[in-house]
Amino acid sequence: MKYILVTGGVLSGIGKGITSSSTGLLLQCAGYKVTAVKIDPYLNVDAGTMNPYEHGEVFVMTDGSEVDLDLGNYERFLSCNLTKDHNITTGKVFKNVIEKERHGDYLGQTVQIIPHVVREIVDGILNAAKDADADICMVELGGTVGDIESMPFMEAVRLLGRLEGKENVMVIHTTLVPVVGAVGEQKTKPTQHSVKELQGLGIRPDIIVGRSSTKLEEDIATKIAFFADIPRECVISAPDARSIYDVPMVFLEQKLPELVEERLGLKPKKPDLTKWEDFAERISNGKKNVEIALIGKYTDLKDSYISHEESLRYAGALLDCKVKIRWIEAPDLEDSGNTKTLEGVNGVLVPGGFGSRGAEGKIMSAKWARENKIPYLGVCFGFQLATVEFARNVLGLKNANSAELDPDGQHSVIDILPEQEDVKDMGATMRLGDHEVIISGGVAKELYKNGTIFERHRHRYEINPKYIDQIEASGMKYTGRDKSGRRMEILELEGHPYFMASQFHPEFKSRPDAPSPLHFGLVKAALDHKKSG
């Protein structure tokens, strides 16, 4: 097993995840089996209870674990399904160590950061890699070098090299090379300090990826190589790209796979990026275009809906179409009381969410799409609120609502799941992960081309069974249900060009070569709507 550790310096959010994903993709396209681990040095056990404004989208994996959005990036780039073991947090590590101490596993030792916590981190990496049965494990360490919360993980990086052998472990350090002043001069000083800090921890980077708005100038790259004590060719330039999907080609041009193979003693293999290059070209150069409104409550941070954004782009690439997203804050719709900001869009997407803030704005958008025959896709909360809107304005149940929003409401067409009634804890307690969905027909079966599917879930509420017959008699059909037939999973509206919604999250299984069928259907319907004028 080979391990590639990806660290970051200067500041967070400069592209460690893309560096790691792109490197993994290149090696995968060369024929290696690649897996990935993301380390998050925060005290939360997982990302499940975090506000999207804190870390962006909460990504749900097949096994139901709620993790950092970077894991979604790995799944999309590597076309794989990861598990809870591939996300290591400080909270999870401390929890495991304390439980072992209480259980007596340390046989009376004084439990300390070194060796116990550090060893727990290393064991987590080794177990995740072993379970994946991979040739290479990419390990991304969140945060930046020098952060106090990252120190145990930096020590774990050093220890991993000693335990597994230096020939099996390498470090790629991603750092910022800012461009300063009107003359556009690239500065190396932040990188110098970052590398010095890393070396002071006993970790020597093998490759440095320099993030900058422009390609690294030759003298700048040479200077970085000199003070980092690495060959010039081991300094990789990572300028701003047309899209993140162009980054693997940028790295390939600079022979990154060859550098990795040489450092880790791997047999040289040439990556075949033919399909990926075609995809990257299509995602950036669609001949057609549509605009879809995304009605959210965290739209100031686009990463809150990154899986939806990428799902729409993947669908567009397959349809030779560029998808423009009109980001609309649901509370703004609510406050204004009108839907003028929706005018001119070719489709509407209402994603998942929780709580009353913005709920009425989402209901307004579902009503507008239904009445104006604009293609609509609702997901999770968007599925539930489409049902609330239909109950209010078609069935005439004026007080219809979700029990989440109005616990004492007269018509709770959305009710809490029976198994959730006595749940008190918030973390990892929802109906999560892959569940079977049986599709009986309709547009859903045309899109999925299958009567049985498995999709990822994250919810506490469901359609109230008492109202299903009444709703279906009025034209809203539930064409997807769980295997018991009692839990509603997919709805579609009769007589509408495309009005679909799902209780599950189709965006989490969307891949570059296989976009979510429901997102594909939305983009296709949006194109048809635009064409019909």
Range-by-range predicted roles:
Residues V180-K187, Q384-N393, L493:
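Glycine-rich, charge-decorated loop segments at or immediately adjacent to ligand/cofactor-binding or catalytic sites
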